[in-house]
């Protein structure tokens, strides 16, 4: 395209889909073999209290690792960036009021949803499916909120493929404990995904559906995250943790839904054992059962979506094990173990011997940041092939990420710093 030719978004989307189909048919490309080399990390309030400083530090860190992401020739389309935060109740209560409802004191749940932008009928169909599944369990829907976005922060190609971005806000009974509420939402989301797919709607994706946390992400540059999502600049948007990610696609077609963080983790690296891990997961599904899923076990199969990238597949299995009742550190230990001689007599060796008998390791260069429940963690692969640095401040913040110095911290406030691995 010459400099005086106008960008045609419809033609671009069509040619992109045709190119992807040709490459898949020729065996030159498969979505399942997508890998990334990215920037990743988290910020956490050590005492668990929500703070604006956590959000500000995470935004600063994300914007500092812009060089770890790719930039399209248009100069503004990125491979993807995003941030995962706890839900700020006060922020959403004021938006619930704008729907004509008042906060009923129940568990507030929020879903961040990508809808087909150019098909109004499909949009409404998706909303109906989402509401039906939420209402089926007796929850009260406050309404939908159109997320404010500034499309001027996007490049031509990101704009051409941009979804309609909305949030569904609803209330769950306070009598539900947090774990059961999250498990219900997991099953609801999986049923929604299947129902939408059955209607042959492909441009639909739920970034997050939770009473705990919410994910803002997209196909923009890291430094544009707050420009595109002005919500993140609201001083009422506070959080006790933030997981952030800047994507660099090494062999992929960047898409909005493949931007990270995913629902549990943000991942820098690649899973070299992906095909074997996926095959083993399919085998496990045949005998998979758990009392907490009971008759709904088939709603969550297949665990790994067809065509999922390595990071998305890893996230899906992480999520399953967590929803089954395991803790986040334990799931990381099972799936991305450290190098260990399991034939030894130490308690740690016996732990890893047990883990190896339960779950095949997902191996390859990796650094992850993840959140679930009361945990936020960072970790690396057994060979330490992806970096992860951390800083603990005297004012109670823990900052971890791919590089040192992503967040400016006065030296007098550094209690401890170092590296993982």
Which residue stretches match the model-derived regions?
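Conserved short alpha-helical segments that host acidic/polar catalytic motifs at enzyme active sites
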Residues: 2-421
């Amino acid at each position: 395209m010459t400099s005086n030719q106008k960008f045609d978004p419809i033609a671009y989307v069509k040619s992109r889909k045709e190119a992807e189909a040709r490459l898949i048919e020729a065996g030159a490309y498969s979505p399942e073999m997508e890998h990334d080399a990215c920037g990743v990390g988290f910020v956490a309030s050590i005492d668990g209290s929500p703070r604006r400083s956590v959000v500000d530090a995470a935004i600063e860190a994300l914007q500092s690792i812009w060089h770890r992401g790719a930039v399209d020739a248009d100069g503004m389309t990125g491979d993807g960036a995003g941030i995962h935060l706890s839900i700020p109740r006060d922020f959403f209560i004021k938006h619930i009021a704008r729907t004509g409802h008042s906060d009923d004191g129940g568990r507030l749940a929020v879903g961040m949803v990508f809808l087909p932008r150019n098909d109004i009928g499909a949009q409404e169909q998706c909303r109906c499916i989402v509401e039906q599944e939420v209402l089926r369990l007796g929850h009260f829907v406050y309404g939908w909120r159109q997320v404010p976005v500034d499309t001027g922060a996007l490049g031509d190609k990101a704009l051409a493929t941009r979804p309609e971005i909305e949030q569904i806000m609803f209330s769950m009974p306070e009598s539900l404990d947090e774990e059961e509420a999250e498990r219900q939402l997991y099953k609801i989301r999986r049923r929604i995904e299947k129902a939408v797919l059955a209607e042959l709607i492909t441009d639909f994706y739920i970034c997050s559906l939770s009473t705990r946390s919410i994910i803002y992400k997209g196909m923009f540059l890291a430094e544009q995250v707050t420009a595109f999502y002005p919500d993140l600049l609201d001083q009422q948007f506070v959080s006790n943790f933030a997981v952030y990610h800047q994507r660099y696609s090494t062999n992929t077609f960047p898409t909005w839904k493949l931007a990270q963080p995913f629902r549990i983790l943000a991942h820098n690296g690649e899973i070299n054992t992906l095909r074997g891990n996926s095959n083993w997961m399919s085998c496990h599904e045949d005998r998979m059962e758990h009392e907490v899923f009971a008759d709904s076990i088939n709603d969550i199969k297949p665990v790994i979506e067809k065509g999922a990238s390595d990071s998305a597949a890893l996230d899906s299995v992480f999520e399953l094990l967590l929803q089954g009742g395991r803790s986040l550190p334990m799931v990381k230990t099972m799936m991305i173990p450290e190098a260990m001689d399991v034939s030894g007599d130490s308690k740690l060796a016996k732990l890893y011997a047990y883990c190896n008998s339960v779950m095949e390791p997902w191996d390859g260069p990796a650094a992850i940041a993840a959140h679930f429940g009361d945990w936020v963690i960072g970790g690396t692969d057994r060979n330490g092939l992806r970096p992860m640095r951390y800083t603990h401040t005297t004012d109670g913040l823990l900052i971890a990420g791919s590089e040192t110095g992503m967040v400016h911290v006065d030296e007098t406030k550094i209690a401890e710093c170092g590296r993982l691995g």
